[in-house]
Curated annotation (Swiss-Prot):
Domain of life: Bacteria
GO molecular function, one term: transmembrane transporter activity
Residue ranges crossing the lipid bilayer per the database entry: 19-39, 56-76, 90-110, 113-133, 144-164, 171-191, 222-242, 254-274, 288-308, 317-337, 376-396
Name the UniProt record assigns to this protein: Multidrug resistance protein MdtG
PROSITE patterns: MFS (PS50850)
Gene responsible for this protein: mdtG
A cellular component annotation (GO) from this entry: plasma membrane
Annotated membrane topology: Multi-pass membrane protein
Gene3D superfamilies per record: MFS general substrate transporter like domains (1.20.1250.20)
UniProt keyword list: Cell inner membrane, Cell membrane, Membrane, Transmembrane, Transmembrane helix, Transport
Main location: membrane
InterPro entries with a match to the protein in the record: MFS, MFS_dom, MFS_MdtG_subfamily, MFS_sugar_transport-like, MFS_trans_sf, Mutidrug-R_MdtG, Tet-R_TetA/multi-R_MdtG-like
Subcellular location(s) per record: Cell inner membrane
Length: 404
């Protein structure tokens, strides 16, 4: 029996990749609460300079990830997804270790760019599971996997803040590197993949990848949907704390209230993603996607009219429950419309669009709030999501008509 004939325990792989995504999500978000403080510690002074450098070191990771993702996706389709998971986890661990040793802002900026270049654990985990899980369970599996990164990202800022308070800023980078190395070890020992390497000559070129897709126009619309989902999420991030302060008035625990309101969508997504993924396996992920987008629009609009932080918290919880279905539904539709041979590249292209959304979303939110106020951000974001819902519905309708 050849290695490629050995049956894969995809359920165990799902469990281990979930742990890997949890650790990666936690590791990335561990350093986020004090990133501006570390920039200041590296010698940047002055309000405008601090804001500029903080924005640069935050966004450059996503920019370089967007550039590098297609390359790593192609390599994953040639060499296998497990080796890409190992490369990502070990590479990020080394970079995080070096970040804790940075002596000036330029070194730190270069390392943040390198982090983006070497990242990609979560999209490769998605590609691995998507190619191993039975098709009729794709929605549930990818929905479950998405909760790993979300739960890690929820826990990370809290743990990072506590660790920074007790041990200082630099040790948190060393702790984060250790977490990523644990992720590397888990992947090395417990994830199994039957993959026959493909020579460079046998690899499909970009045109052949597009030609092999069942519906290239639909796949492109799914990439755009991913971008807009991240734009909608990111547009609110820069103004959330300030908006909560405007609603709450003069209170002493504004940081706690803001942190809670920032985290409730993630908690809701944890609860909803596997359930809605399973529902999508029954009724179709395209229905879940369109309904979740429409619900998001209906929840974003009243956010601009709330009068108390608790009204905002309730609406954001409901929004998180709807949002928990969006990316898994997109990923499931990508699985349905591509082959295992090109899964690495398709998921990496999707990651590039996601990274672009991560950069443009906060910029859009900051620009709108500066010109028209905090409340306008929610209305404009609702308009963007409504456009996405109409665009996605039209793309899916064309696909259905083409099949008929």
């Amino acid at each position: 029996m050849s290695p490629s004939d050995v049956p894969i325990n995809w359920k165990r792989n799902l469990t281990v990749t979930w742990l890997g995504c949890f650790l990666t999500g936690a590791a990335f978000s561990l350093v986020m609460p004090f990133l501006p403080l570390y920039v200041e510690q590296l010698g940047v002074t002055g309000h405008s300079a601090l804001n500029m450098w903080s924005g640069l070191v935050f966004s450059i990771t996503f920019l370089f990830s967007a550039i590098a993702s297609p390359f790593w996706g192609g390599l994953a389709d040639r060499k296998g997804r497990k080796i890409m998971l190992l490369r990502s986890a070990l590479g990020m661990a080394i970079v995080m270790l070096l970040m804790g040793m940075a002596q000036n802002i330029w070194q730190f900026l270069i390392l943040r760019a390198l982090l983006g270049l070497l990242g990609g654990f979560i999209p490769n985990a998605n590609a691995l599971i998507a190619t191993q899980v039975p098709r009729h369970k794709s929605g549930w599996a990818l929905g479950t996997l998405s909760t790993g990164g979300v739960s890690g990202a929820l826990l990370g800022p809290l743990a990072g803040g506590l660790l920074a308070d007790h041990y200082g800023l630099r040790p948190v980078f060393f702790i984060t590197a250790s977490v990523l190395f644990i992720c590397f070890l888990l992947t090395f020992f417990f994830i199994h993949e039957n993959f026959l390497p493909v020579s460079k000559k046998e690899m499909l070129h970009v045109r052949e990848v597009v030609a092999s897709l069942k519906n290239p126009r639909l796949v492109l619309s799914l990439f755009v949907t991913t971008l807009i989902i991240q734009v909608a999420t990111g547009s609110i991030a820069p103004i959330l704390t300030l908006y909560v302060r405007e609603l709450a008035g003069d209170v002493s625990n504004i940081a706690f209230i803001s942190g809670m309101i920032a985290s409730v969508p993630g908690v809701a997504a944890l609860l909803s993603a596997p359930r809605l993924g399973k529902l999508g396996d029954r009724i179709g992920p395209e229905k879940i996607l369109i309904v979740a987008l429409i619900i998001s629009v209906l929840l974003l609009i009243p956010m601009s009219f709330v009068q108390t932080p608790w009204q905002l918290a309730l609406l954001r919880f409901l929004l998180g429950a709807a949002d928990g279905a969006l990316l898994p539904a997109v990923q499931t539709l990508l699985v349905y419309n591509s082959t295992n041979q090109i899964a690495g590249r398709i998921f990496s292209y999707n990651q590039s669009f996601r990274d672009i959304g991560n950069v443009t979303g906060p910029l859009m939110g900051a620009a709108i709030s500066a010109s028209y106020g905090f409340r306008a951000v929610f209305c404009v974001t609702a308009g963007v999501v409504l456009f996405n819902a109409i665009y996605s519905w039209n793309s899916l309708r064309r696909r259905r008509l083409a099949i008929e």
